[in-house]
């Protein structure tokens, strides 16, 4: 019985505040869309791939130990690619107006497990700049690794290219709108229940019975002011007339 009453109160609150819920949800959804399309700067991503292969020598066959060694080196290479030794040279070569740390924040270096392929991904507000940075990093790394580690086992597998109509990786307007809708709906429902909780006026017999734990014997209807005034004047005139007859 308590559960049904509670559910009834919940539905009653939602119904009573439905306009508030709709307005807040719509406003949040619209704000999410406007921010996604007009306020946030699009970010583009481009990637290049390098291959860590066996050392270049006169042997044509690939030894298992060579592959294992290259796989172990990949983690080291991932760190070196994002080090100032490489990034400072990239900044100098491209004439970028940023620090090596700022450039580092734009770069993601990854590789699949047991794969000799390393992916270098760069994010930037300009798709062409992202591609240029990725390709320059790969080129500089290929040149520098021979002197840094005295090895020559890196080759560029594929270069970053810019499509005719590049798509930004962020923001994602549809996702942002969906999140804004969900947040607006949840927030508006929470606000509705908060307002209902702060409203301590008694609006029904059921509320009064629940609050005082006593039965309601009857109710007094609300009398309109005009009717109340008319009845008051009518009663006053009747009393006056009665008083006059009594005096006679």
Curated annotation (Swiss-Prot):
Q: Could you tell me the keywords of this UniProt record?
A: Capsule biogenesis/degradation, Cell membrane, Exopolysaccharide synthesis, Membrane, Transmembrane, Transmembrane helix
Query: What biological processes does GO assign it?
Result: capsule polysaccharide biosynthetic process
Task: Tell me where it mainly resides.
Answer: membrane
Q: Which named protein is this?
A: Probable capsular polysaccharide biosynthesis protein YwqC
MF terms from GO for this chain are:
protein tyrosine kinase activity
Q: Which Pfam families match?
A: GNVR (PF13807), Wzz (PF02706)
The entry's function note states: Required for YwqD kinase activity. May bring YwqD and its substrates into contact. Probably involved in the regulation of capsular polysaccharide biosynthesis.
Ribosomal protein listed as a keyword? no
Q: How is it modified after translation?
A: Not phosphorylated in vitro by YwqD.
Classification of source organism: Bacteria, Bacillati, Bacillota, Bacilli, Bacillales
Q: Which GO terms describe its cellular component?
A: plasma membrane
Q: Which family does it belong to?
A: Belongs to the CpsC/CapA family.
Which residue windows are transmembrane per the record?
Answer: 18-38, 174-194
Q: How does it sit in the membrane?
A: Multi-pass membrane protein
**Subcellular localization, per the record?**
Cell membrane
Highest taxon of the lineage: Bacteria
